């Protein structure tokens, strides 16, 4: 059993005892002190999506009662060679979650933060990452409230980094502007590919033209922009993977995240694997895309 004792006058702050003897270690107050409290990075999860991607094993869900209306996307689309085309683009989505669901979840997040505050008192918050799911389904006004609640409780320097994930399939200019006004200064856009055929194979709700528009808008608005890009996609050749990376580099973002498509447990792709590049092609793809990124001045880490 454990018995607390008086920590005054240099007495032990905690002593572990048993029925027969004193267990070997006594913790003194000085052992629990830091010269400086370590800084704090905060992750906030917003779990809903327009659609569950077949490769995704993250905690993400199609929200009940979600309302997704189809809208016309820019006429510009990308053909297989990633050249602008005049062919009509597919329909896109303007998506929103029910406001009462957003409000209830926001209130729950703030209540959870209040509960955890005693564990992080004295630590300086230096970054916030809002991930998902698809955080860009949330209204900018509620993202503003969320960040204001965090700042009020933890404080944050003006130079602190606030990242938010966004899906090109939910891109609307006014939303991006609203997130920027709320304090988001780094946007991470889940492009995955600029090829319409590969995006369809991945179950994505956007096309290549939408991805380009979303990234261009983000670059104009935010201090930092990241593109998430996947390679070793179903039926993908080395040239196609390289074309994706070259298109991403041409958009002049500050960061590029390259991921190999993998078959994760408990996903549709794990149950029904699509035809992926063979090992030799995979090696060639990795060398090509990493080399292109290095040649553009990006450092691998």
Show where each model-derived region lies.
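Local cysteine-cluster metal-coordination motifs and their immediate loop/turn environment
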Residues: 45-60
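C-terminal scaffold of the Radical SAM
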Residues: 29-41, 59-74, 78, 82, ...
